[in-house]
Structure formats: C-alpha cells, structure tokens
Design a protein with these regions (language model features):
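Short, charge-rich amphipathic alpha-helices with coiled-coil/heptad character
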Residues: 1-24
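Low-complexity, intrinsically disordered short peptide segments enriched in small/polar/basic residues
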Residues: 1-4, 59, 81
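A broad, low-specificity signal for short, low-complexity segments enriched in glycine/proline
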Residues: 1-4, 34-37, 43-46, 90
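Residue-level signal for short amphipathic helical patches enriched in basic/charged
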Residues: 14, 29, 48, 91
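Amphipathic alpha-helical coiled-coil segments
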Residues: 20, 24-34, 38-41, 74-84
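Short E/K-rich amphipathic alpha-helical oligomerization segments
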Residues: 40-64
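Long amphipathic alpha-helical coiled-coil segments
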Residues: 83-91
Length: 91
C-alpha cells in the first residue's frame, strides 16, 4: 500500500481525489509565493508589472543598471505566475 493509499483511506477519500487536492494546494502555495515575490519587486519600483518597469526605464525614471536584475526576475516571475494559473485550470 502506498502512502497516498494510506492517507486516502485514513481521510475517507479516493487516492485520485487526494492527489488532485494535493496538487491544487501545492500550486496555490507556489502561486502565493510567486505573487509575493512579484509584489516585492513591483513595490520597489512603484509598478504593477514588468511592462510598467520597462516604461519607467525607457522614460529615465529608473536606470537600466539599477533595474536590470529585477527586470528579468519580474519577467520570469510573471511567466511563472501565468504557468501556475494555467495548471490550476487543468487540475
């Protein structure tokens, strides 16, 4: 008997339902972490997303040198956020 089977039996749910709920919980936790990381970077520059940060750099309100690492981090985090949201729709 697998761990999934034992836990499912203990909580009177099917293994499939347990896995589905586990995946959802994991993805929601991951999404919360990503959104928190996005918030920290966005707040630092007073923007909502990577496009606003890019706009501030282009207008000279933020130097490219200062925002370089955060720009790519924010871009990657926003991509990760969308990926997680799509996975949540499928679960």
């Amino acid at each position: 008997m697998t761990v999934v089977d034992m836990v499912a039996k203990e909580f009177h749910v099917s293994p499939k339902e347990l896995l589905k709920d586990s995946f959802k919980t994991y993805l929601h936790q991951k999404l919360s972490k990503v959104e928190a990381d996005i918030f920290i970077i966005a707040k630092k520059y007073g923007v909502k997303d990577v496009f606003e940060l890019d706009s501030k750099v282009k207008r000279g309100l933020v130097t490219e040198k200062d925002a370089y690492d955060d720009y790519f981090s924010l871009d990657n985090l926003e991509f990760e956020k969308e990926k997680i949201k799509k996975l949540l729709e499928k679960v």
